[in-house]
């Protein structure tokens, strides 16, 4: 059944911006002109914009003002592939409003977040003091993919120019049911690994002449999955390890395998870093099989932003107040979920908070959000920006 579009006489500016961006088929790492549109709109507001193309990835860095308080908005214009088109009720790159819902790829993740901030910037920019605030837009087309040349590169670029962000608001879809019900102040880290276990091939009828690599591997798997990682706390999930794949190569049922490759992923708390976790995993593996080889890939560091004593420089406080004003309730402060680009900007000196629309349909067929969630997010973002000059 197809979606029947609704007719709206005067759509809100955030909805208009969302429809413009969602109509661009920006499947990662393609930007499809999204950043050109943003650059056009931001330059009209007085931003100085730079565009960089790094290994096929488009990055936009926009700067307004020159004050000592550095506030940044981080977002991504790329989206995941739409999947089977026949399962969509409307074309994924032809945004449709129906029954007060906005449908299309990027409706939740995260072109509406960018659109809400663009609308909020138009509303608030005249009230900001350029002598007090430096306002950054940091946008990439490489968040859904490898994330090697997007926000990671932008942060390194800013660091080389001695730019120290105080606050970074990430427009990822952080909410559960309604915009403002949940914000993210940290994320667990992620580390993937590959273990190679060697045995000796032989006939299954003569096990004494062979060494079964799977049997050896199972002991390693048992040690890893039963290791007592910390269970976490109320404000940060604990460390978990999952075996994601095992491979012996070609298979017949009368041969004892000579080698096994084990793939695993660890989601870890801020109590570890990549180096300390890798060393612990090596120790666990070598305690079972000294000859096993292990390598690591796709590291993502954990981070946790904590409240600042200085309320004027506390992004968490500003976000909570803005959400209370817009919704009448305070948000749940969470660190759940997968990795995000917030990890690239987080530091002891930079508070990172994710605030966005509900994430219930992200990466799904018929991705959508309620229009009320978009409009609420625009109000929240506007209030956050206005708080920078209070």
From Swiss-Prot:
A Gene Ontology BP annotation from the UniProt entry:
L-arginine biosynthetic process
One Pfam assignment: Peptidase_M20
Q: Does Cell inner membrane appear among the keywords? A: no
Tell me the active site: 78, 143 (proton acceptor)
Recorded GO MF terms: acetylornithine deacetylase activity; cobalt ion binding; succinyl-diaminopimelate desuccinylase activity; zinc ion binding
- What UniProt keywords apply to this chain's record, in alphabetical order? Amino-acid biosynthesis, Cobalt, Diaminopimelate biosynthesis, Hydrolase, Lysine biosynthesis, Metal-binding, Zinc
Function in brief: Catalyzes the hydrolysis of N-succinyl-L,L-diaminopimelic acid (SDAP), forming succinate and LL-2,6-diaminopimelate (DAP), an intermediate involved in the bacterial biosynthesis of lysine and meso-diaminopimelic acid, an essential component of bacterial cell walls.
Q: What is the official name of this protein in its record?
A: Succinyl-diaminopimelate desuccinylase 1
Q: Which organism is it from?
A: Alteromonas mediterranea (strain DSM 17117 / CIP 110805 / LMG 28347 / Deep ecotype)
**What is the name of the gene encoding this protein?**
dapE1
